[in-house]
């Protein structure tokens, strides 16, 4: 009995610690990119997956103690896929007392009509879904649209574009929508997928399967995801370092003439970003940048939280 109580205490401690880390990650992303401002009405796109559930939970948590006032409205798009459990999200959101809207649009029927059997339907489905969400945001008077993409999604997109698209382009934490009418934010931009997975399991979110449409998975994205997971296991810190690199771009040491004026360099030009080291190799840190062992991460989390609580 006593042993079970000790295990329960430890589990609760670990869940609390995990939630605090996710909360800190989301808070830092919001601050770094000015994602949420006074009076914002945030449309939280809820798919029924682990990422969007976690995003809603953390935003609700932050809302209680934030120095600014903002409101949340959860939106789910019921695409009329066979077997979609349409009762789950309304019941969950009503239990939470969260304002919500279920948008019913038969995009499934449109996609099935346009795309041959066995082909990936994600591209067309995504375009249709995007248009409906933009329209819904306008109808609800939302000032921001929050999507549940996390750090791993952002890195996957970067490598997909590098390997298959020939460009260095990731997934922005905050940007104007392609129709020029909405601001899209990704509050989970600094969050690790493995943290979200653990948090989702601990909270027991009522997960809705994402493959109800029967579409074939995006094999290219799956290959990239498997590669990153393998690197994370074999080379601790590599994922963190790559994400840090996305925040520390040096245009003068790349080859994009639109980002840096290489043609304008002449004798007498100033030295930029340390200049060219010719044959000398740049010193590389022994430890990956932006990474710290799990134990140290936990210790620093505790220290930061204590400081915040004292304040």
Curated annotation (Swiss-Prot):
Reactions this protein catalyses: cytidine(32) in tRNA + S-sulfanyl-L-cysteinyl-[cysteine desulfurase] + AH2 + ATP = 2-thiocytidine(32) in tRNA + L-cysteinyl-[cysteine desulfurase] + A + AMP + diphosphate + H(+)
- Which positions in this protein are listed as binding [4Fe-4S] cluster? 122, 125, 213
Q: Which GO terms describe its cellular component?
A: cytoplasm
> Coiled coil: which residue ranges?
none
Provide the primary localization: cytoplasm
**Broadest EC class assigned to this enzyme:** transferase
> Which controlled-vocabulary keywords does the entry list?
4Fe-4S, ATP-binding, Cytoplasm, Iron, Iron-sulfur, Magnesium, Metal-binding, Nucleotide-binding, RNA-binding, Transferase, tRNA processing, tRNA-binding
**InterPro entries reported for this sequence:** Rossmann-like_a/b/a_fold, TilS/TtcA_N, tRNA_Cyd_32_2_STrfase, tRNA_thiolation_TtcA_Ctu1
One GO molecular-function entry: tRNA binding
Bound how, and how many: what does the cofactor note say?
Answer: Binds 1 [4Fe-4S] cluster per subunit. The cluster is chelated by three Cys residues, the fourth Fe has a free coordination site that may bind a sulfur atom transferred from the persulfide of IscS.
Superkingdom of this entry's organism?
Bacteria
Q: What stretch of residues is annotated with the motif PP-loop motif?
A: 47-52
Where in the cell is the protein located? Cytoplasm
Subunit-level organization = Homodimer.
Q: Record's HAMAP family? A: TtcA (MF_01850)
Q: What else is known?
A: The thiolation reaction likely consists of two steps: a first activation step by ATP to form an adenylated intermediate of the target base of tRNA, and a second nucleophilic substitution step of the sulfur (S) atom supplied by the hydrosulfide attached to the Fe-S cluster.
**What family does the entry list?**
Belongs to the TtcA family.
Q: What name does UniProt use for this protein?
A: tRNA-cytidine(32) 2-sulfurtransferase
Native source organism of the sequence: Klebsiella pneumoniae (strain 342)
What is the name of the gene encoding this protein? ttcA
């Amino acid at each position: 009995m006593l042993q079970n109580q000790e295990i329960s205490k430890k589990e609760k401690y670990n869940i609390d610690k995990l939630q605090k880390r996710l909360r800190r990650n989301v808070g830092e992303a919001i601050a770094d990119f000015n994602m949420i401002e006074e009076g914002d009405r945030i449309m939280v796109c809820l798919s029924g997956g682990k990422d969007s559930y976690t995003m809603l939970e953390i935003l609700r948590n932050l809302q209680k103690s934030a120095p600014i006032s903002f409101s949340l409205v959860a939106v789910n798009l019921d695409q009329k896929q066979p077997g979609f459990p349409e009762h789950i999200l309304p019941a969950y959101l009503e239990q939470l007392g969260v304002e919500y809207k279920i948008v019913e649009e038969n995009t499934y029927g449109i996609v099935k009509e346009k795309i041959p059997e066995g082909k990936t339907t994600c591209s067309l489905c995504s375009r249709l879904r995007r248009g409906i969400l933009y329209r819904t945001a306008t109808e609800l008077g939302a000032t921001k649209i929050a999507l549940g993409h996390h750090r791993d999604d952002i890195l996957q997109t970067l490598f997909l574009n590098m390997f298959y698209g020939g460009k260095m382009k990731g997934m922005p934490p905050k940007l104007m929508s392609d129709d020029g009418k909405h601001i899209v934010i990704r509050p989970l931009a600094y969050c690790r997928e493995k943290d979200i997975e653990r948090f989702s399991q601990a909270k027991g979110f009522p997960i809705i399967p994402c493959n109800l449409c029967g579409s074939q998975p995006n094999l290219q994205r799956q290959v990239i995801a498997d590669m990153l997971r393998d690197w994370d296991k074999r080379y601790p810190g590599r994922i963190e370092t790559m994400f840090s690199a996305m925040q520390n771009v040096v245009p003068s040491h790349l080859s994009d003439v639109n980002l840096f004026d290489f043609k304008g360099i002449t004798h007498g030009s100033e030295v930029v970003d340390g200049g060219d080291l010719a044959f000398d190799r740049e010193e590389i840190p022994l430890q990956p940048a932006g990474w710290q062992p799990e134990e140290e991460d936990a210790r620093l989390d505790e220290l930061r939280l204590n400081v915040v609580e004292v304040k």
